[in-house]
Amino acid sequence: MSWITPELIEILLTILKAVVILLVVVTCGAFMSFGERRLLGLFQNRYGPNRVGWGGSLQLVADMIKMFFKEDWIPKFSDRVIFTLAPMIAFTSLLLAFAIVPVSPGWVVADLNIGILFFLMMAGLAVYAVLFAGWSSNNKYSLLGAMRASAQTLSYEVFLGLSLMGVVAQAGSFNMTDIVNSQAHVWNVIPQFFGFITFAIAGVAVCHRHPFDQPEAEQELADGYHIEYSGMKFGLFFVGEYIGIVTISALMVTLFFGGWQGPLLPPFIWFALKTAFFMMMFILIRASLPRPRYDQVMSFGWKICLPLTLINLLVTAAVILWQAQ
């Protein structure tokens, strides 16, 4: 069959890898909601969901059925198009950001030379979902939550990007595969420890996770920018948040902890174990830390995180120049 060319085979393999990787990410994001509730129960010395299936193993299925059959209500005075578009953007933005993450040698959806810039672009796109949701709902609590979320996300994305510049300078590339290969001898978390700390803090803030979940504060804003959402639209916001956690955890592994590299076990297993560890850390942080005031969150970012990232970048540049002499 002459129509089967090497180019066609390469395209089909790329599509297959994209479908497999993105399905795994969505599945991990969905199952993390169940795992979080079970782990929170363990951390707080109480029972988690344990009634549906063996040990609560079918709780996720029950939640999905409930979500499918809930009324997909749209407020009467809302902007219907933007109201519907917002959860789609929230779901797809950080899911697309995972496309640049190499899970093992040769297994990456898009091996871009501007991989880190693509991630920052997708993280910035998620801000529009929040603004669209808050403004289109025609609800004052939604709008206040959206304004908080957009200001917080844009602020912490500054530190998110600056914290990665030390890694880029050491690897000499924005390509994620090149960054993983540059950690063959020493993981970046050792020379870039302060960069890792800042990236982890900013990653939690960008995902709007506790303790940086002021945009969704129940006591102040009645659940924030998605108060008017129900049914599958709310489900897209819900799963999108967990996909963001999976993506940020995978980026921590790729940029600072050697990616798929490790002894004895297959590369994908190492990548999965490292990523699962950081996903559990997100849950442990939620169970351990109180929620600060909104002004404290913004002050912490600009007065502590920003100077720390700038000092880390300057020291990294000085070390690289010294080694080049």
Curated annotation (Swiss-Prot):
Q: Name one GO cellular component term.
A: plasma membrane
Q: Chief localization class?
A: membrane
Its transmembrane ranges are 11-31, 81-101, 114-134, 154-174, 186-206, 237-257, 265-285, 304-324
Any GO MF annotation of the entry: oxidoreductase activity, acting on NAD(P)H, quinone or similar compound as acceptor
Q: Which UniProt keywords apply?
A: Cell inner membrane, Cell membrane, Membrane, NAD, Quinone, Translocase, Transmembrane, Transmembrane helix, Ubiquinone
E.C. numbers: 7.1.1.-
User: Among the record's GO biological process terms, what is one?
Assistant: aerobic respiration
Topology in the lipid bilayer: Multi-pass membrane protein
Q: Which InterPro entries match?
A: NADH_UbQ_OxRdtase_su1/FPO, NADH_UbQ_OxRdtase_su1_CS
* Keyword rRNA processing appears in the UniProt entry: no
- Catalytic activity field: a quinone + NADH + 5 H(+)(in) = a quinol + NAD(+) + 4 H(+)(out)
Main EC class the enzyme belongs to:
translocase
What family classification does the UniProt entry report for this protein? Belongs to the complex I subunit 1 family.
Q: Which NCBIfam families match?
A: PRK06076.1-1, PRK06076.1-2
Protein task: NDH-1 shuttles electrons from NADH, via FMN and iron-sulfur (Fe-S) centers, to quinones in the respiratory chain. The immediate electron acceptor for the enzyme in this species is believed to be ubiquinone. Couples the redox reaction to proton translocation (for every two electrons transferred, four hydrogen ions are translocated across the cytoplasmic membrane), and thus conserves the redox energy in a proton gradient. This subunit may bind ubiquinone.
Subunit comment: NDH-1 is composed of 13 different subunits. Subunits NuoA, H, J, K, L, M, N constitute the membrane sector of the complex.
Name of the protein in question:
NADH-quinone oxidoreductase subunit H
The organism named in the record is Escherichia coli O7:K1 (strain IAI39 / ExPEC)
Q: Lineage of the native species?
A: Bacteria, Pseudomonadati, Pseudomonadota, Gammaproteobacteria, Enterobacterales
Protein's gene: nuoH
